[in-house]
C-alpha cells in the first residue's frame, strides 16, 4: 500500500482528464510536478515506513535509478519536444498518450499473469485486502473533489484534480517491486499484488468518472479551453 501511494501520477490521469473534459494543462502540470518530487520522496517514504520492519532492506539507489529511467528521462524528453515543437506535440499528444495507456495496461496484465502464484495466497490476499487496495482510488478521487470544491475551485479544474489524486503510476510501482523483490523478503508478494490490482482498478474507476463527471461536476462551455 505504501509503495503505490508513494508513486507519482502518470500518463493515465492525463488521458482520463482529456476524455473527462477536464483541465488537461493542469493535469499535465500536476503529473510533472509530482513526478519530479517522487524522485526524492518515493525512496524516502519507503525507507521511513519500512525502517522498523525486520528482514527488509530498501535499496534506495535501485529505486532512484529505476525512476530516472522509467519516469524522469521520458518526462524531460516530452517537455523538450513540447517546448521546441509545440504544434507537433499538440497533434501527437493524444495518440502517444493512448498508445502509452495500452502499453501500460498490457504490462500490468502481463505482470499479473506471470505472478499468479502471489495472488493465490488467499490467506494474505483476502477480500479485506482487495477492498482496501481498490478503495485507494475511490478515496483519492473523492478527496480530490471535496477539497477543491471547499476551496472554491471550478468544476473544470476539479475534474483534473480528482483524477490526478486517485490515479497513480501503477506500472512504475510494479517495476520497483520486481527489481527489489530479493531484498523485500516475504513482503514482495503483497507489494506486487497491491500494485497490479490498483493498476486494474484505476482504469475502471477512471472510466466511471468519465461517465459520471458530466452530472456531478457539470462544466460550462466557456470554462473549457
Q: Where does each model-flagged region fall?
A:
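Alpha-helical transmembrane segments of multi-pass small-molecule/ion transporters
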Residues: 1-225
Amino acid at each position: 500500500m505504501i509503495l503505490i501511494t508513494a508513486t507519482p501520477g502518470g500518463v493515465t490521469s492525463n488521458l482520463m482528464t482529456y476524455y473527462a473534459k477536464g483541465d488537461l494543462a493542469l493535469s499535465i502540470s500536476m503529473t510533472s510536478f509530482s513526478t519530479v518530487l517522487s524522485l526524492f520522496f518515493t525512496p524516502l517514504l519507503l525507507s521511513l515506513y519500512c525502517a522498523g520492519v525486520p528482514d527488509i532492506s530498501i535499496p534506495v539507489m535501485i529505486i532512484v535509478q529505476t525512476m530516472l529511467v522509467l519516469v524522469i528521462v521520458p518526462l524531460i524528453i516530452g517537455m523538450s519536444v513540447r517546448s521546441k515543437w509545440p504544434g507537433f506535440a499538440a497533434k501527437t499528444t493524444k495518440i502517444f498518450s493512448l498508445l502509452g495507456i495500452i502499453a501500460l495496461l498490457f504490462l500490468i496484465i502481463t505482470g499479473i499473469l506471470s505472478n499468479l502464484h502471489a495472488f493465490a495466497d488467499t490467506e494474505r490476499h483476502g477480500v479485506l485486502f482487495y477492498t482496501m487496495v481498490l478503495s485507494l482510488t475511490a478515496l483519492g478521487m473523492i478527496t480530490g473533489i471535496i477539497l477543491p470544491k471547499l476551496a472554491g475551485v471550478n468544476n473544470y479544474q476539479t475534474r483534473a484534480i480528482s483524477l490526478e489524486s486517485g490515479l497513480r503510476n501503477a506500472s512504475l510501482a510494479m517495476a520497483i517491486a520486481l527489481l527489489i523483490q530479493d531484498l523485500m523478503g516475504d513482503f514482495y508478494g503483497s507489494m506486487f499484488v497491491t500494485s497490479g490490482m490498483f493498476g486494474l482498478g484505476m482504469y475502471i474507476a477512471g472510466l466511471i468518472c468519465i461517465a459520471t463527471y458530466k452530472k456531478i461536476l457539470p462544466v460550462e462551455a466557456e470554462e473549457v479551453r
